[in-house]
Amino acid sequence: SEMCIRDRHYAIPHFNVWNAEMLMGVIDAAEELRAPIIISFGTGFTGNTSFEDFCYMMESMAKKATVPVILHWDHGRNWTILKNAVDHCMNSVMRDASALPYEENVAEIKRCVDYFHAYNIPVEAELGHVGNETVYEEALAEYAYTDPSQAKDFVERTGCDSLAVAVGNVHGVYSAEPKIRFDIIEEVNKEVSVPLVLHGASGIGDEDIKKAIQCGIAKINIHTELCQAAMEAINEHKDEPFLAVERAVRQAVKERAMYKIKLFGDDGRADE
C-alpha cells in the first residue's frame, strides 16, 4: 500500500490533536470526505492534556470511524516515551533522532525498527534537521537539508517505514515565505522506496504543497493551521456560552481539515 501512495500522487494528512474539539473535528472531516487520516499526539502537548487518559478517546474514535485512522506518536525523543506511547494505544511512531550525528541516527532508528516491527508498528524517521527556531531566516542558518545519497543509505540500513525530509520546511509559523527545495524531494524520492513526510506544512502555500506531492511527498503534518482555525472561531464566538464556543471550534477544525484533505488529494481514498 505504501507503494501505491507513492505512485498515485496524493498525501495522507497527519493532524496533531490534543483536545476533544480537535480530535472530533478532524474525524468529522475524514468521515465526511471518506478520507484515511493519521491522528497524532506528542510530548509538546502533555502540559495541556494527560496523554495516558486522552489516548483512550483517540483510540475509541479511531476504532468507531468508518475510514482508516492511524494513531501516531510524533517526534519521539527517546525510547521511554515511545514505549509509553505504544503501551497507550498508539499504532505508529516517529523516532526523531535527527539532531544526532548521522551514524547515531542510523543506530537509533535501526534499534527502534527492530523492536517495534515485532509488534507490527511502523517507524518514521527524520534525516536532515528541520529545527525549531522561530525566525525563518535564523532557522535556515542552522538548517541541515536532507542529502539524497545519504537518504538511500539511511533507509536501507535502518529499515524505517517512512522518512521525514528537511527541504526548507520549518515548524510553527513562517516569518518569511518558505522556499521549498523540490529538487531535493525529487532526488530523495528517486533514491528511496519509502513514503516521504513533510513536517511543518501549515505555512506552506497550496501550490507548493501540490508540487511537493507531485515530487513524492506522501504524508503531510498539520498542527498550527488547526490551532489558527480554532482561535478564529473562539474570537468570533467569544460572547457566547462555552458550550457554543466549543462546538464552533470543532466545526472550524473540521472545515480546515476538510480543506487540507481535498488539497492533498486524499478525499474518497478510503473507498478505493
Regions found by a protein language model. Give the residues of each.
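C-terminal alpha-helical cap/extension of soluble enzyme domains
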Residues: 205-272
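Short, small-residue-biased leader/transition segments that mark boundaries at the very start
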Residues: 3-5
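Alpha/beta enzyme core
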Residues: 1, 18-40, 44, 52-66, ...
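Terminal accessory/targeting
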Residues: 9-14, 272
